[in-house]
Amino acid sequence: MTMDALKRQAAARALEYVEDGMRLGLGTGSTAKHFVELLGERVRDGLKVVGVPTSEATRADAERCGVPLTTLDDLDRLDLTVDGADEIDPDLNLTKGGGGALLREKIVAAASDRMIVIADETKWVAGLGRFPLPIEVIPFGLAATRRAITEVFAKAGVSGELAVRKRPDGHAFVTDGGHWIFDAHLGQIPDASYLAGLLNPIPGVVEHGLFIGLARVAMLAGAEGIRIVERR
C-alpha cells in the first residue's frame, strides 16, 4: 500500500467520529487534505457540518469539496479538529508546522473539545526532534530573536542549526499571517514540554510547532491496518 493510501485510510477512520451538526476544525497538509475530501463526500450525501480551516490552502480545498465554512469569529468553540502531524510521541505530543500553518492549527486545536491526529505509521516516534521544529517569527529584529531562541535551546539541553525556511525560488517562506519560519534541526528533544514553555515568551516568536497536550487520539495507518492510540 502506498504512503498516500495509508494517509487516506487514517482520514477515513477519523471521519467515523464526525456526527451531524458538528463544528469541525480542518487541518492542513497532505493527510488532512484527504480528510477534507472524504468529508466533502459525506456532505454531498447530506451530512450537516461546518468547518473552520487552518490555512488558505485548506480553505480552498474545502470550498472545492463543498464543505460549509465559518471562522472562529463566529464560533468560540469547536467540537472536533482533525489534523495531521510531522511527529507523534507516545504521550501524543506533536511536532507540526511542516506545511507552515502551525499558528492557525494551534489556535483551532486549542478551541476544540477534541483533537484527532491522523498520520501514517512513520510519524510515530519515541521522542520528538527528528523532524525540524518550526518556529514562526516576526521578520523584524530577526537576529535578536534568533539569539534568544539559541539561548533557550542551550537552557533546554538542545542545539542545532536554526535556518530560515525558504521557498523554491530562494526567498523566505511567508506564512498566511505574514510571518517567517525558523526550522530548528535539533535531533532528540529531551523534554518537549519544557522547551515549549521556554519558547512561548520570547519576543518575536509568534508560535512554535510543539503541540503539547492538545491531541486526544492518534490514528496511525500501517500495512496491518489502523492503530488507535489515546492519550494516557
UniProtKB/Swiss-Prot annotation:
InterPro entries: NagB/RpiA_transferase-like, Ribose-5P_isomerase, Ribose5P_isomerase_typA_subgr, Ribose5P_isomerase_type_A. The active site is at E105 (proton acceptor). The keyword Isomerase applies. It comes from Nitrobacter winogradskyi (strain ATCC 25391 / DSM 10237 / CIP 104748 / NCIMB 11846 / Nb-255). Disulfide bonds: none annotated. It is an enzyme of class 5 (isomerase). Substrate binds at T28, G29, S30, T31, D83, G84, A85, D86, K96, G97, G98, G99, K123. This is Ribose-5-phosphate isomerase A. Keywords: Isomerase.
